[in-house]
């Protein structure tokens, strides 16, 4: 029986056997329950996804809620690890290094292949991410949160144009009035296959400032050591884009090899996330909360390994011998540092005016980052090595480096004002009305350089500013593309709920928005002289999206619902040359908006003993899916397919099991996202002749969309017991499964066939001892030390297999976390 068949069988057993038994299960006496454990696991969950407080079961569409306790038990620290834990939610698992190039994916609504660049082409993400009520982008750890809400399906009416497939809401803890409390926590452990020590320190404090003010602050520093040993690194003048390789023999500048060095535990990462908030409640019915967040992450390299290189003479330097590849071994010519910084300031005001509540959310966020990549081996492997002589000379420059840097920033201001009516059993109608404004400026630069090549040419007697007799930019830059964008969104939205029966209701909603998008891109290729100045291209859009959502409560806390909802994403322009050896078709100069129509029906409920369940069927029709990729020529562009569809189902259930104080959570999602019609576009074939081949970019009906699995599942168990007076023990385990994931949809530079990840399995366990004011946790992540292949190589068996890089999951970590709570 296959892994997914076993998961499906387990779900069926849970549906058939657990509910009746759980309904008969009696809660143990209160004195036998560990403090705040079992009650917390089974307590009713409330959410604010509809802009009013409701129980999770009463929200008439599919959504998941992950509590702070569950985040800790599952080892979830950021959006990528959250995506591994929640079925139906996925991301390309590149870690924090490629944060700006990877986005959350819900229900398979994504057509963009694995990121080959350090940032997206600035197309909007298909899923909106919010901290509280504020939209945000960038990298931050999930710290001091009340819960995470995963809203599945288009959320165009309440959440706008950035929610083509759904939304993620990260709900932070707010300051508490008249309460002084805090926590200090430290953790440390052992990471398999690493000599480094992972550790983290965090603290939070809540301080009352009189009767109407309260302050809350939290901070966390997290260090993750590397686990990949890297070989063949050059010592350079610096670790930036233009760091010049140092000569092993300065007296022989033409033939001297570089100074080689190896680095154990290369791919480290360190993160800081801090948030401070101030709550003011001068009177009943009015609150104001101001908050700031700062997050920074930096590191070197990534979790890439090369087990295939047989060892031997370097294909680029015959005087140097490299060791064989193997588990947790990698090869790189240079260090590859990266960083990202994110800041968010927000102000939330709420005023109870009697018949309704008026709310305002103002926010301003910035994110900036850079990624340095070594593309030397990839270039050497392209066209069976045909590119290498042009770039590295004959004989090959023994110190040749071909690196690229991606740097970007975005500044975004948003303002939203909402009017939410008071609800109650005597109300026939409820409504939400609002206006929204967004103003974003963003820019990104892609720069390619050959550091050390000008010095090597000078040693050969070459004239200044030449690149094997081809004019280049001053210095070592061979290519640069700069993209500057300005985006404005002005929207009005509303939802009206009619309670046409005592237990029945229907919600209708709409959002009308007017958008202005201006894009100006420059393109400078010094190798094959092509220079395109930045010419602004405007892409205005105006559209109305809708929603119809009937639901009926057929028994106490048991609901059936249906929903039709729409999503929309803006179009834009590409900076691709239309002349020269890498000229592209004018059809690739712009890309069109895409949109989704979601048809969904489901059942949700909760029994008196705490057992809850959700079952949803969905079918999403997707028009003009946007695809961002590296073209066969190496140019970067966004373009459209014709039509696609995602259909499937989701199931979640949690509740007590047969053993007192033992609680289960099981969830499963199936999403068959695929093209529903063929498409093709002309593109440059990359042969440096300016040849545009009809249909070179293409996709076929039935082809699976990239970036997400068809099947994903998770199972978690939580057991509480009192082991002595004032000593409580909590045991938890969770396992996740994901089927193989396709990495791309269309051909790109050096890639002619679709590659797949391996299936993904992961088990985490932990044990927590509570003895107030202390809490001690022993944890193990990746219990069986599985090396899941998250991203396979896109260039196989080239340059002596030096291009065979596999992105793998983090090895097993065993550690202890100690917290003092006051």
Model-predicted regions and their roles:
Residues 40-177, 601:
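Acidic, small-polar-rich N-terminal luminal/periplasmic segments of exported/outer-membrane proteins
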Residues 279-283, 419-422, 430, 434-438, ...:
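Structural signature of Gram-negative outer-membrane beta-barrels, strongest in the C-terminal barrel
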Residues 1-76, 80-86, 206, 284, ...:
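N-terminal Sec signal peptide and the immediately downstream disordered periplasmic leader
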Residues 658-663, 736-746, 768-822:
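C-terminal beta-signal and adjacent terminal beta-strands/loops
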Residues 256-431, 438-440, 612-614:
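Outer-membrane beta-barrel domain signature, strongest for Gram-negative TonB-dependent receptors
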Residues 202, 346-353, 357-363, 368-375, ...:
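Membrane-embedded beta-barrel scaffold of Gram-negative outer-membrane proteins
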Residues 193-300, 343, 410-415, 420-438, ...:
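Transmembrane beta-barrel wall of Gram-negative outer-membrane proteins
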Residues 420, 434, 502-503, 612-621, ...:
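Gram-negative outer-membrane beta-barrel transporters
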């Amino acid at each position: 029986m296959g892994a997914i068949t076993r998961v499906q069988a387990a779900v069926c057993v849970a549906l058939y056997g657990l509910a009746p038994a759980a309904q008969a299960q009696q809660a143990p006496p209160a004195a036998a329950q560990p403090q705040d454990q079992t009650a917390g696991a089974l307590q009713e969950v409330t959410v604010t996804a509809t802009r009013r407080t409701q129980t999770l079961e009463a929200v008439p569409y599919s959504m998941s809620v992950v509590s702070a306790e569950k985040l800790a038990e599952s080892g979830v620290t950021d959006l990528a690890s959250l995506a591994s834990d929640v079925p139906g939610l996925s991301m390309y698992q590149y870690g924090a290094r490629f944060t700006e190039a990877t986005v959350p994916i819900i229900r398979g609504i994504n057509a963009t292949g694995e990121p080959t660049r350090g940032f997206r082409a600035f197309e909007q993400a298909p899923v909106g991410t919010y901290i509280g009520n504020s939209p945000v982008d960038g990298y931050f750890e999930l710290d001091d949160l009340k819960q995470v809400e995963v809203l599945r399906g288009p959320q165009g009416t309440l959440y706008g144009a950035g929610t083509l497939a759904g939304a993620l809401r990260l709900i932070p803890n707010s300051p508490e009035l008249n309460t002084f409390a805090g926590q200090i926590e430290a953790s440390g452990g052992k990471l398999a296959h690493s000599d480094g020590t992972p550790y983290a320190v965090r603290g939070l404090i809540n301080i009352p400032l009189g009767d109407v003010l309260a302050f809350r602050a939290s901070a966390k520093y997290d260090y993750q050591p590397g686990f990949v040993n890297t070989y063949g690194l050059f010592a350079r003048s610096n670790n930036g884009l233009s760091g010049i390789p140092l000569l092993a023999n300065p007296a022989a500048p033409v033939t001297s090899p570089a100074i080689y060095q190896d680095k154990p535990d290369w791919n480290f990462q360190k993160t800081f996330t801090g948030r401070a908030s101030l709550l003011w409640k001068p009177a009943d019915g009015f609150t104001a909360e101001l908050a700031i967040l700062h997050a920074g992450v930096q590191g070197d390299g990534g979790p890439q390994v090369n087990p295939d290189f047989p060892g031997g003479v370097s294909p680029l330097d015959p005087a140097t011998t490299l060791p064989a590849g193997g588990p947790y071994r990698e090869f790189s010519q240079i260090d590859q540092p990266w960083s990202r910084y994110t800041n968010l300031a927000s102000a939330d005001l709420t005023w109870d005016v009697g018949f309704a509540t008026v709310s305002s959310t103002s926010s301003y966020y910035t994110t900036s980052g850079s990624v340095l990549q070594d593309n030397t081996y990839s270039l050497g492997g392209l066209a069976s090595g045909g590119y290498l002589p042009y770039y590295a000379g004959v004989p090959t420059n023994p110190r040749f480096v071909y690196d690229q840097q991606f740097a970007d920033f975005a500044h975004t201001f948003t303002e939203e004002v909402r009017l939410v009516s008071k609800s109650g059993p005597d109300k026939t109608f409820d409504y939400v009305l609002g206006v929204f404004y967004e103003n974003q400026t963003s820019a990104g630069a892609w720069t390619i350089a050959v550091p050390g090549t000008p010095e090597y040419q000078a040693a050969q007697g070459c004239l200044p500013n030449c690149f094997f007799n081809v004019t280049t930019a001053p210095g070592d830059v061979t290519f640069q593309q700069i993209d500057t964008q300005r985006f404005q969104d002005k929207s009005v939205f509303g939802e009206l709920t009619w309670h046409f029966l005592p237990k029945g209701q229907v919600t209708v909603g709409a959002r009308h928005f007017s958008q202005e998008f201006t894009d100006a891109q420059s393109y400078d290729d010094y190798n094959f002289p092509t220079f395109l100045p930045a010419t602004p291209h405007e892409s205005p859009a105006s559209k109305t999206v809708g929603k119809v959502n009937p639901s009926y409560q057929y028994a106490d806390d048991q609901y059936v619902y249906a929903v039709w909802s729409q999503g929309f994403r803006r179009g834009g322009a590409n900076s691709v040359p239309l002349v020269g050896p890498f000229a592209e078709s004018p059809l690739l100069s712009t890309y069109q908006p895409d949109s989704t129509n979601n048809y969904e029906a489901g059942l949700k409920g909760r029994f008196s003993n705490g057992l809850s369940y959700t079952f949803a069927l969905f079918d999403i029709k997707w028009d003009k899916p946007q695809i961002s990729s590296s073209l066969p020529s190496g140019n970067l562009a966004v373009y459209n397919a014709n039509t696609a569809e995602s259909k499937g189902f989701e199931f979640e259930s949690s509740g007590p099991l047969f053993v007192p104080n033992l609680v289960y959570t099981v969830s499963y999602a199936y999403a068959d996202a695929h093209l529903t019609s063929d498409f093709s576009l002309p593109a440059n074939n990359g042969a440096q002749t300016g040849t545009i081949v009809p249909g070179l970019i293409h996709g076929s009906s039935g082809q699976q969309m990239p970036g997400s699995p068809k099947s994903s599942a998770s199972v978690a168990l939580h057991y509480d017991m009192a082991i002595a007076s004032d000593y409580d023990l909590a045991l938890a385990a969770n396992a996740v499964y994901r089927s193989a994931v396709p990495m791309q949809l269309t051909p790109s530079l050096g890639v002619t066939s679709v590659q797949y990840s391996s299936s993904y399995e992961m088990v985490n366990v932990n044990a927590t001892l509570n003895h107030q004011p202390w809490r001690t946790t022993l944890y193990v992540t990746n219990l069986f030390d599985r090396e899941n292949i998250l991203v396979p190589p896109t260039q196989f068996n080239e340059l002596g297999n030096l291009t065979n890089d596999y992105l793998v999951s983090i090895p097993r970590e065993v550690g202890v976390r100690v917290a003092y709570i006051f």
